[in-house]
Amino acid sequence: AMIEGSGVQGILLTGGNSLCKYGGEAKERDQVEKYLLEWSMKKDLPVLGVCRGMQLVQDFFGNELNPVDGHVGARHELSIVEGRHLSDVLTKLASVNSYHEYGTKVVSGELAACAHSLDGVAMAVEHVSRRVYGVMWHSERESPFVKEEQEVFNYIFK
């Protein structure tokens, strides 16, 4: 109710600890973010989930997450899935950082994988018909900032 009439033009679901379903302890955060995702889709507003946010998007649409090895404090090259909305902007990224303990190799239902790490973990997803996207890396943790990562945000929040 508070968000109605606020002028929000898009939602960024940020990183953080795991979802409660996967050992996290922020039940209220999980509930609020699911509400924001539903609300945004009803309003046809763009949503970007970053790391935990992408995990929430995947869980919301029924994709199961599993523990993944080699994804905390690591860098990954991306294998881009051609023909996705994000494909062109993602091809400009040489590699991305990684700080997550959970992920999935199987993206199904209303979501489609846009990019995988070379070990097969989905690193970017998009909804097949709505403006909902997710990336597993943290642009804000790059130093120096990677300008090509800004293009991902520009595409989603145009």
Q: Which residues are covered by each model-predicted region?
A:
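Proline-centered loop/turn at the N-terminus of a beta-strand
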Residues: P46-L48, E64, A112, R131
